[in-house]
Amino acid sequence: MKRVAILTTDLYQPHCDVNDHFNLAFLYALAQQEKLQLGGIMLDEDKPDPEITPEICGDPSVESIAQLNYITAIPVPCAIGSRIPLRCEEDIQVVISSGKKIPSISLLLGILESTNLPVDIHMCGGTRDVLLASRIRPDLFTKDRVRVFVNAGTWKIQTPLEYNVRLEPYTFSQLFQLPCQVLWAPCFDEAVWPFHVTEFANYFMMEIGPLFERISDSMKNYFLYMFDRVVNTGWFTYLRGSVNQESLSKWSQQKRCMWSMPGFLMTADCYVDTDGNVTDNPENSVFDYVPVKVSCSPDGLVNWKLCAESEETNIKIFHVRNTEKYEEAMCTAAYETISCLGK
């Protein structure tokens, strides 16, 4: 049975982190291949904290979603989330009791109410909107039909806190109390550069050049619109224009950090073997998720331990089964998956 994917993302134009635009393209590619149904995009409202991320970012990037909607002919809805900080339980109750409608939460709850398909929520940005939705309608977050993929945190050394956890430690901590299945993918072993592939983190580094060699002109323009931090409103004209070869050459030399894509593949019931092939066979997969017991303090510090399959838990942690092959395999899978767009 095909699953519905919902993405929460801190996607901006001009961008904050280019990875968010790659995540978006990867999900659309899986939807175009009919491996999942892309139900909606929940956009973070708040700008990044300048003390954490000094880059100047724009508004939530509805342009990027519109570009991919056009390229794929898949009309995916999007909505913008809450801007009210949630630092404690009292803050959550104040927002809920106000009765004010929050667009992204309305989108999420509407999908959960209307579909008979299982739903996967991929959290690749802020944590507040999904948590608020789960408090408003906990009956919709049942273990048998909803999985929440939490792409945040570190699994080994937790100081300093990873970016998304540091933004709102309390809401992050509450995600582990959700009644549905929770699949936690830490970003790193510790949030200190340089980053490395490690056993329980989904980070990998990807060269941009090999992707640009494979993709259509419209997808090149999708990425260049983001990389060049274009601020004019002509996103559609830009998408259909000629490719700026100088810019393409410049960005082809880059390497960029990637996360989250393994979880998207799980929604598609797919895995990646050691040669980078996307397959439905988990036998030779470079990653999986394994059951854990988790507790998390209100300040975002996680204590976890592996547990046996027979032990009762609704939480799993991301696991790299082959640390030597993982990065290369994930890069190959990303290149081949995204290359289908616009062709």
Q: Residue locations for each model-derived region?
A:
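Conformational coupling and interaction surfaces
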Residues: M1-A5, N23-L38, R166, A185-K343
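Metal-dependent C-N hydrolase catalytic cores
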Residues: K2, I52-N116, T323-K325, A329-K343
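Active-site histidine-anchored catalytic micro-motif
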Residues: K2-P60, E90-T198
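Structural signal for hydrophobic packing residues in well-ordered secondary-structure cores
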Residues: A31, N69-A73, L112, P179, ...
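Short, conserved catalytic or adaptor-binding loops enriched in Gly and charged residues
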Residues: A31, Q67-A73, Q174, I208, ...
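Residues in well-ordered beta-strands of folded domains
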Residues: A79, F149, L265
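Short glycine-rich loop/turn motifs that provide flexible caps or phosphate-binding loops at active sites
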Residues: I80, C124, P262
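Short glycine-rich anion-binding loops that position phosphate/pyrophosphate groups of nucleotides
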Residues: R83-I84, G126-T127, C270
